[in-house]
Swiss-Prot record:
The name this protein goes by in its record: tRNA-cytidine(32) 2-sulfurtransferase
Organism this protein belongs to: Paracidovorax citrulli (strain AAC00-1)
Pfam families, per the entry: ATP_bind_3
Matches recorded under InterPro entries: Rossmann-like_a/b/a_fold, TilS/TtcA_N, tRNA_Cyd_32_2_STrfase, tRNA_thiolation_TtcA_Ctu1
Function: Catalyzes the ATP-dependent 2-thiolation of cytidine in position 32 of tRNA, to form 2-thiocytidine (s(2)C32). The sulfur atoms are provided by the cysteine/cysteine desulfurase (IscS) system.
Species classification: Bacteria, Pseudomonadati, Pseudomonadota, Betaproteobacteria, Burkholderiales
Recorded GO MF terms: 4 iron, 4 sulfur cluster binding; ATP binding; magnesium ion binding; sulfurtransferase activity; tRNA binding
Motif residue range(s): PP-loop motif: 58-63
Cellular localization per UniProt: Cytoplasm
Signal peptide range in chain numbering: none
Family annotation (NCBIfam families): PRK10696.1
Enzyme class at the top of the EC tree: transferase
A cellular-component GO term for this protein: cytoplasm
Binding site for [4Fe-4S] cluster: 133, 136, 224
Subunit-level organization: Homodimer.
Record gene name: ttcA
């Protein structure tokens, strides 16, 4: 038997295919993120020529992903728009103040750190054990609107993704008795600011993978996101479970938000049921109430055998 050379590098040879696969998957993920963010921007006309977009940075995976992909799209977009990254330092104890400024400086994107002690206000006003999310978000929103005015920004970009939108829909249905989600684009209550959500088509699993791939310096939120047993967390876990057990279900739920049939719901403000009368004219929105809905067959549950009974 011929002996192998002693200097044979087995580790290097074995690692090349694995490394190539990792790089290939990362490239596919980047292309998908750019495609989905670009599609949302076009579908809802989120960014226009000459816009100055304020990208709100929390230090979480989603806002990092949002800024990162917008920087990539800015370089290839057919229009000119500017970016400015803004972080609100809410003076939480132990908050690593150096992380975001150092990261943002390295990107080359103009940035602004707004220092406001909302942490003390929230802790003083909200009783111990109660959810702080509502008050924290209202305080943060007001400050960010003011900063947008001061910086001359025409759009405010938030990092909410597809799963956030679906969670909000289900939370409103389960606990609020209304069909309401997060819009991809909205005008603020005072009519002065346009808020956009460029990650609207992006599933959370993609922002998680991108954050890992890019090794973003994640800053955890100790005020709201880390509180246990919140309704949003429970709904999020339910959606993730559905996504694993019933492939396509979450996608179809999201698609339903873009495919509304008001005449087949029960909201009289969206469809005039009061004055509905027979006209003798065929309607595309006509009566199919007695037709059996046709749906694709659901996949069998794990461990169960599907038996056809004739």
């Amino acid at each position: 038997m011929t002996a192998l050379p002693q200097d044979t590098d087995w580790t290097a040879d074995a690692s090349r295919p694995a490394q190539a696969r990792i790089e290939r998957e990362a490239h596919k993920l980047e292309k998908r993120l750019c495609r989905e963010v670009g599609r949302a921007i076009v579908d809802y006309r989120m960014i226009e020529e000459g816009d100055k977009v304020m990208v709100c940075m929390s230090g979480g995976k989603d806002s990092y992903t949002l800024l990162d992909i917008l920087i990539k799209l800015q370089k290839r977009a057919p229009i000119h728009f500017d970016l400015v990254a803004v972080n609100l330092d809410q003076k939480q104890p132990g908050f690593p103040e150096h992380i975001l400024p150092e990261y943002l400086a390295a990107t080359g994107v103009p940035f602004h750190i707004e220092n406001q002690d909302t942490y003390s206000i929230v802790k003083r006003v909200v009783p111990e054990g109660k959810t702080t999310c509502g008050l924290c978000s209202r305080l943060r929103r007001g400050i960010l609107y003011r900063v947008a005015d001061e910086l001359g920004c025409t759009k405010i970009a938030l990092g909410h993704h597809r799963d956030d939108i679906l969670q909000t829909l289900l939370l409103n249905m389960f606990f609020g008795g209304k069909m309401k989600a997060m819009p991809p684009k909205l005008v603020s209550d005072d009519g002065r600011h346009v808020v956009i959500r460029p990650l609207a088509y992006v599933p959370e699993k993609d922002t998680t993978r991108w954050a890992q791939q890019r090794q973003f310096p994640i800053i955890p939120c100790n005020l709201c996101g880390s509180q246990e047993n919140l309704q949003r967390k429970q709904v999020g876990e339910m959606l993730r479970d559905w996504d694993k057990r019933f492939p396509g279900r979450v996608d179809n739920m999201f698609n339903a938000l873009q495919n509304i049939v008001p005449s087949h719901l029960m909201d009289g403000t969206l469809h005039d049921f009061q004055h509905l009368k027979a006209t003798g004219i065929a309607s595309d929105d006509g009566d199919k109430a007695f037709d059996a809905e046709e749906f694709p067959p659901a996949p069998a549950l794990p461990g169960l055998q599907v038996v056809q009974i004739s």
